[in-house]
């Protein structure tokens, strides 16, 4: 099961992208890979 903490940490690397647009931070994949492996 995925916890709220896992979701928060996975998305935190992408918050700047979500707020400002532009390129996704390299290697972050917005936490999608981490969530899929949870």
From Swiss-Prot:
Keyword annotations from UniProtKB, A to Z: Lipid-binding, Secreted, Transport
Gene3D superfamilies xrefs: Plant lipid-transfer and hydrophobic proteins
GO terms for biological process, alphabetical: lipid transport
Cellular component GO terms held in the UniProt record: extracellular region
Location(s), subcellular: Secreted
GO molecular function: lipid binding
Repressor as UniProt keyword: no
Main location: secreted
Task of the protein: Plant non-specific lipid-transfer proteins transfer phospholipids as well as galactolipids across membranes. May play a role in wax or cutin deposition in the cell walls of expanding epidermal cells and certain secretory tissues.
Family classification: Belongs to the plant LTP family.
Designated name of the protein: Non-specific lipid-transfer protein P2
High-level lineage: Eukaryota, Viridiplantae, Streptophyta, Embryophyta, Tracheophyta
């Amino acid at each position: 099961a995925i916890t709220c903490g896992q979701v928060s940490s996975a998305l935190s690397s992408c918050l700047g992208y979500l707020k400002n647009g532009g390129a996704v931070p390299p290697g972050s994949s917005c936490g999608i890979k981490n969530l899929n492996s949870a």
